[in-house]
Amino acid sequence: MNRTLVMTAAACLVATAASAQTPAPDAAPPFVLATYYRCDYSKQTRADTLYKQVIAPLLDKQIKAGHLTAYGFSSHRMGGVFRRLESWTAPTLAHLIAAQDAYEAELAKVNPKAGAEFDAICGSHDDYIWNRTLGSPTNAAAPTPAYSYSRYMGCNLSKEGEADMIMETAFAPIMNKHLAAGHITAWGYFI
């Protein structure tokens, strides 16, 4: 199983186009669907336009329906083969699945051509579902950041509990010091 540490300038999974609502303070850790796209480099800006004009409004509907609490679409900066990252955040796995089902049905109804065009540009992807288990409080009022950073760690399955404990006792205090100093505005640890 992989663990991931996400440090951002303003939100836990940050994107160039993001929307969020503040979860209740006692809410369970959120689930995040992350889709990592391989896109045609020469057409990726068209994919960005399609996302902003067609996909984002449909995801806004999923926030209004209470299925999602946030979503984002990030561009590639360095490393790896993925050109774009889409993230959806939901309070439960059931909400995440409901959002996906409703979104896909709505896109097929209102603009299937745009969906097909986006898929042709970003035709290959990997999907992951993460559960945020540790991190700073979210700040839905924070402005969309210009940059975020993520680190993926492959853990020995028999020692994941130890890795989680090290993250909580060694890394979390360091991240919280950076948060308090204003170097970052949020961070999260997902499993």
Label every PLM stretch briefly:
Residues 1-4, 21:
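Positively charged n-region of N-terminal signal peptides that target proteins for export
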Residues 7-16:
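Bacterial N-terminal signal peptides
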Residues 20-191:
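Short S/T/G/P-rich N-terminal loop/turn motif that feeds into the first structured element of a domain
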